[in-house]
Amino acid sequence: MATKVMGMEKESLILGRFKKPFDIKELPKFPGYAAMIGPGIVWAGLSQGSGELIWWPYMVAKYGVFFLSWLIFYASLQYWINLEIARYTMATGEGIFEGFHRVHRIYGWAMFIMSMIVMLWVGGYVSSGATALAALTKFPAGWDAAGQTRFWAEVAIIVIWIIFILGPVAYKVVEYVEILAAFISFGGMLIAVLLSPAVAKVAGEYFPALIPWYASGFNMLPQNFDAKDMNIFITLIAYTGAGGFWNLLYSYWVRDKNAAMAAHIGRVTSPITGEPEPIPGVGVAFTASPEAHEEWKKWMTWQWIENLIGVVMNTLTIVLTTLLTYAILRPEYLATGKLPSGFKLVVYQAEWFGHLWGDVGRGILYIVGFFFLVDAYITALDGAGRTVASNLYTVPGIPERVEYRKIYYWVVTIFTVIGMITVLLEQPGVLVLLTGVTNMLIMVIFTWVFFYQNFVLLPKIHPAGKIVRPSWIVLIFLLISAIFFTYSFALYLDVTF
């Protein structure tokens, strides 16, 4: 609801909507694909985290090829979510959370709170990656695996904070790290697959299992499924890609890449080494015209391709990690019952390289595993700063009084401290699973709301009208995604509770 204060309308921060009209500016010209490559690979780098390195291998080692027949289907669903996240930001220059507040304040704040719950446990990614450094260095000498893991986690968290503070442009820090991580991870796995005799022996069993529903029928769970693995099951679905809150961060990478109307919005820059760029409290929109329509098609075609690069790259990474698992780690599980766990969460996967190159190979895997997981923490830290700043920027008066980047860097610092505390409290696997379950719930909710936000509300409030509305093809595939995610989460609740 809105109230009248001193003759002026003051919007409600709880019961109303964020209704500030967009500024009107010209839709920028599409600069070409070479200039715009980045957000899709960043998304792939983030996605190549716990699902790809830990939980998909866990499920394949324990249950064989059953879940592989869902892999391509799982992965494809997130494509349509990313598309709609990017569409809103490209059309308005606003981050996706401003869009949530335009749907309704209650919805916006609810999504903000759930996202912050996810962020409380994000230190688990650093401690998961630190299990690899602990195994590689055996330092500090005389400490047990838990102590060494926590030591390296604390060191990594501090170093990452320093990199953030000194990096001139926040997005560039994330982009460089994620592109490096994506190619190191993918390249390392590909080399191991191509050289491994064990992989060649199982290829005839493995690749047919990737055909959707070949190995599972239409059953979501195998007959021998252990109900204790339901947290892993739902995390697996959420993280066959970025998942939940992490998907929403795609909005900010597209924005800082200056895609479409986001080119009129400033980037987050370092308070020490960067020059301030203006970030307004309201987005910008273009008006309808034949020329704008044609230019918008170019921007959306780029997004279809850019998004596809990220999804395909991440899916291929899962194929590589699960192929190595099926060839090398599943026989070991059948013989010994060994699975990734505790403070040696990444140590188990060292045999992917170890069976080829011995201790040198295991050492390389530890480094690759560290990149797999710590890059996710870097991206999440950036996401925390943007999420808090974007939500606060929907509050009247704050954009005029406080710089967006000041909020961002204060939040990055606060969550750095939180991360340093949480890695001392629980084993890394537990922390990551806590984020997975919450992210699945977030994804179920916003996927359904996108039908209203982008198909109904956006064309209504945007000066370009139906030009920015998604097509019926998108509607169909988004509906499939919403139904599937909802059913999966309902199955999780049914089995768990």
Where are these regions (language model features)?
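Flexible loop linkers connecting adjacent transmembrane helices
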Residues: 15-21, 55-60, 82-106, 131-141, ...
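Extracellular loop-to-transmembrane helix junctions
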Residues: 31, 58-83, 98-109, 151-152, ...
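Juxtamembrane transmembrane-helix boundary signature
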Residues: 43, 70-101, 110-126, 375, ...
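Hydrophobic transmembrane alpha-helices that form the core helical bundles
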Residues: 91, 107-143, 153-154, 373-393, ...
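Loop-to-transmembrane helix boundary motifs in multi-pass membrane proteins
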Residues: 146-156, 340-346, 350, 360, ...
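C-terminal membrane-solvent junction of multi-pass transporters and transport-like membrane proteins
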Residues: 177-180, 386, 390, 400-410, ...
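Hydrophobic alpha-helical segments and their helix-loop junctions in multi-pass secondary transporters
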Residues: 184-225, 243-251, 447-462, 488-496
